[in-house]
Amino acid sequence: MVTIGTPKSATATKVVLCGSGELGKEFVIELQRYGVEVIALDKYPDAPAMQVAHRSYVVSMLDGDALREIIEKEKPDYIVPEVEAIATRTLMELEEEGYHVIPTARATWLTMNREGIRRLAAEELGLPTSPYRFAETEEEFKEAVKVIGMPCVVKPIMSSSGHGQSVVREEKDIDRAWQYAQEGGRAGAGKVIVEGFVDFDYEITQLTVRHIGGTSFLEPVGHVQVDGDYRESWQPQAMSLAAKAKAREIAGKITEALGGRGIFGVELFIKGDDVIFSEVSPRPHDTGMVTMITQDLSQFALHARAVLGLPIPNIVFHGAGASRAVVVEGDSDRLSLGNLDKVLEQPDTQMRFFGKPEVHGHRRMAVLLARGLDVTEAREKTGVMMEQLNVKL
């Protein structure tokens, strides 16, 4: 029997959220609907999820001692990582001491670095993947590029959203790719993965939720990425029945191997009826923001239910929808978005302004959402919304 107490009282059900970005913000809002007391952590103040949590701490999630100090002080019922860069050894110790890490500390550890999850997928589970080699030194890296061949993709094993990722197309790109990967890793310089190019028609995110009633699969999400970072997504992605079945089979295998409860974003390449595993995140996925307008229970609502041990008897899909990221370029700590009366004048449109305190360089600051008769119409709507949006730095 699931029981939730009163926030900020002795009976409170408490969640510590490790990472407070825009995905965490929506998750916190869903937890608040159930009366859960939320403590949000991030490395900078006034992060999006902090703005809707009961309280917050500014801390590096890679600082295991600082993380432990907060956990021991707050004594949460659940520890929910929202970022890859986190002190996984500390999480594993805390789990052994009786704390509940979502989905599990092992899943967080495996997916924090591309080596752990790639070896699990390809070598233990036998899932189809791109050819790959790992390299720890520049010499090993150059040898890996030689073995894999060009063009190839180079990524730090610990990074996300395209940080440190580049494509080696010819000899002159090799040195630059190594340096960029060393500078772009979330946890500093280190090992990289060199991946062979995959010939694919399109890529999808197969959102998969593990809950007390079993495993549920959402309609496939198609997306566009620029330099490894999400720019646009839509649901459902049109695909053959055979490919759809294989996508769910692969997603089921990898999420079962990771274990625990919660939402997983399984990234896959599709070529005809063939499906190739790419990556998995054991948390809400940026491309999955489209579910805020396409489903009765968004990926964030599903994650909240799964974490709390609440049932998910069904998921209602309202119809085709699209999301478009608002990526701002410049320097500002007083960003404003204008002309919103025009942006939202089309039927079946929504937006989320994340409220990030500042931008330096490129930063995703909002998302535009639309439903349509089909995916094409929904994407066109978000395109019109973007044209109408007035960004002021």
Curated annotation (Swiss-Prot):
Record PROSITE patterns: ATP_GRASP
Pfam families, alphabetized: ATP-grasp, PurT_C, RS_preATP-grasp-like
InterPro entries in the cross-refs: ATP-grasp (IPR011761), ATP-grasp_carboxylate-amine (IPR003135), ATP_grasp_subdomain_1 (IPR013815), PreATP-grasp_dom_sf (IPR016185), PurT (IPR005862), PurT/PurK_preATP-grasp (IPR054350), PurT_C (IPR048740), Rudment_hybrid_motif (IPR011054)
Gene Ontology BP terms: 'de novo' IMP biosynthetic process
Reaction(s) catalysed (UniProt annotation): N(1)-(5-phospho-beta-D-ribosyl)glycinamide + formate + ATP = N(2)-formyl-N(1)-(5-phospho-beta-D-ribosyl)glycinamide + ADP + phosphate + H(+)
Residues noted as binding Mg(2+) in the record, renumbered to the chain: 267, 279
Alphabetical keyword list: ATP-binding, Ligase, Magnesium, Metal-binding, Nucleotide-binding, Purine biosynthesis
Similarity section: Belongs to the PurK/PurT family.
Protein name: Formate-dependent phosphoribosylglycinamide formyltransferase
Provenance organism: Parabacteroides distasonis (strain ATCC 8503 / DSM 20701 / CIP 104284 / JCM 5825 / NCTC 11152)
